[in-house]
From Swiss-Prot:
NDH-1 is composed of 14 different subunits. Subunits NuoA, H, J, K, L, M, N constitute the membrane sector of the complex. Keywords: Cell inner membrane, Cell membrane, Membrane, NAD, Quinone, Translocase, Transmembrane, Transmembrane helix, Transport, Ubiquinone. The chain crosses the membrane at residues 14-34, 45-65, 77-97, 105-125, 130-150, 163-183, 203-223, 237-257, 268-288, 299-319, 326-346, 377-397, 409-429, 459-479. Its EC number is 7.1.1.-. One of its GO terms (molecular function) is NADH dehydrogenase (ubiquinone) activity. GO terms for biological process: ATP synthesis coupled electron transport. Pfam families: Proton_antipo_M. This is NADH-quinone oxidoreductase subunit N. The lineage of its organism: Bacteria, Pseudomonadati, Campylobacterota, Epsilonproteobacteria, Campylobacterales. Belongs to the complex I subunit 2 family. Its main location: membrane.
């Protein structure tokens, strides 16, 4: 009997990276069922191995790869974003090997969910079909909510519930957008929707775009959709808070680039204008809120929101140069933010000994240089990098984006970016002042800052610092690498 399905047409190699990670995740669960006494070091190394093999499969592709009747698309955007997703997913894993044995990091389920979450992000960035993007979005989101809740304290449960609520709203808006797009264009493929928008003056597509902007706004923590995001960061472990600030957002930006940039030439002029306004509001208001925070983790939460506003400017501009700038900016920001959250994790205590609510009040870092000089200097480096002070990492991303804005005629946008960069310097320098110019608290001693230290965390902090310093030498290599694929 003739086969009904031609597996050659499906091109299973197009989902090889997702299949590899799914198999590793299932293997972790089965192995844990057989033996409950396996250490977290083994789980960490196994997860890193799965991610490394995933990267190997990615570099095995040559050119654009399509599969499953064009539902899966591995193009330049997908390839570059998956490299970033996998790279930082690998770099966050050693942070689980902390000195303190936190509940979530010792569970095999944590590592399985971690891999399933990454599978979701890979599907999000490797498709132009809105249903596949939705499946990836939900797969990653449900795993992420659980990972936050596994931290096993009241505020972590609260953070997970708040994030779940925001995610549910995002999914609802996304589903509304999908339904309306299908009604207007009879397709869920982004290119077909774009074609329909260019050839019809449909109020339906405009309405769908409004819902989609709201949905992606929640996922990227853009103002006014950011709502509970600072509370989510505060309640999450430093590992997951740092991860939330980097990996989910690059997946969201790729979806935004695919959808919105394809619609700029249509009859729907308000899309670009709306994103422009949201980008300016996100940069500015998040910066202002960061100025008044009393906790370093919450400050970094608003800082991450502001940086998302900067990167959204690349989507607004919509040129090839701006798209390259997006990848450059996010890579440079990610190294600095990884380092900053790693330092917070390094100095984390299980008990709230510094403040009745916060784990990392600014006062905690008073005089830190006297106890941890090496860590203090590296934290200062990360703050200077995030502030965009030359010649460190984020400076190059900001310069590239500002150059793209000016060359494309977005002069006002470039001015707003420059003003917000100046505002951000204050709250980044604030922690440097605490570490180097203020006297330590009376109960402060070196052992209190080292209770969660480990060689793995020290390695990630040092590695991030080296990359922030070497940023000037990485810019041309990275931009040339990205240019080959987009």
């Amino acid at each position: 009997m003739k086969n009904l399905i031609d597996f050659g047409i499906l091109n299973l190699s197009s989902i090889a990276p997702m299949m590899v990670l799914s198999l590793f995740a299932v293997f972790i669960l089965v192995l844990n069922f057989i033996n409950k006494n396996i250490s977290r070091t083994f789980w960490t190394m196994l997860a890193i191995l799965g991610l490394a093999i995933n990267i190997f499969f990615l570099f095995g592709y040559s050119g654009i790869v399509r599969g499953f009747f064009d539902l899966v698309l591995i193009d330049g955007f997908a390839f570059i974003s998956m490299i970033i997703i996998l790279l930082f997913s690998i770099l966050f894993l050693p942070l689980t090997l902390s000195k303190e044995n936190f509940h979530d990091c010792s569970l095999a389920e944590f590592y399985a969910l971690y891999l399933f979450m990454i599978v979701g992000y890979e599907f999000m960035v490797s498709s132009q079909n809105l249903i596949v993007i939705l499946v990836g979005l939900e797969t990653s989101s449900l795993a992420l909510y659980t990972l936050i809740a596994l931290h096993n304290r009241t505020r972590a449960i609260e953070a997970a519930i708040k994030y779940f609520t925001m995610g549910a709203l995002s999914t609802g808006f996304f589903c509304f957008a999908i339904v309306i797009f299908y009604l207007s264009s009879a397709s869920l493929d982004i290119s077909a929707i774009s074609y329909s928008a260019k050839n019809t003056d449909s109020i339906l597509i405009a309405t769908a775009c409004i819902f989609l902007i709201c949905s992606i706004g929640f996922k990227l923590s853009l103002i006014p959709f950011h709502t509970w995001i600072p509370d989510v960061y505060e309640g999450s472990s430093e590992v997951m808070a740092g991860y939330i600030s980097i990996v989910p957002k690059i997946a969201g930006f790729i979806v935004a680039m695919r959808v919105f940039e394809s619609l700029y030439d249509s009859n729907i002029a308000f899309i670009q204008i709306s994103l422009y306004i949201i980008a300016v509001l996100t940069m500015t208001l998040a910066n202002i809120m960061a100025l008044i925070q009393n906790d370093v983790k919450r400050m970094l939460a608003f800082s991450s929101i502001s940086h998302a506003g900067f990167v959204l400017c690349a989507v607004v501009i919509g040129t090839k140069s701006a798209n390259i700038g997006l990848f450059l900016y996010w890579l440079m920001f990610s190294f600095a933010n990884l380092g900053a959250f790693s330092v917070l994790w390094f100095t984390r205590n299980k008990q709230n000994i510094w403040h009745e609510r916060f784990d990392h009040p600014f006062e905690k870092f008073n005089g830190l240089v006297k106890f941890l000089p090496y860590t203090s200097f590296l934290m200062a480096l990360f703050m200077i990098s995030l502030a965009g002070i030359p010649p460190f990492s984020v400076f190059w991303g900001k310069m590239y984006l500002m150059g793209s804005a000016i060359s494309s005629g977005f002069i006002f946008m470039a001015v707003i970016m420059a003003i917000n960069s100046a505002i951000a310097v204050y709250y980044y320098l604030r922690i440097i002042v605490c570490m180097f110019l203020k006297e330590p608290l009376e109960n402060a001693e070196a052992t209190l800052y080292k209770q969660n230290s480990s060689n793995a965390i020290k390695f990630i902090i040092t590695f991030s610092a080296i990359l922030c310093i070497l940023a000037p030498f990485m810019v041309k290599f990275w931009t040339d690498f990205v240019l080959k694929f987009i």
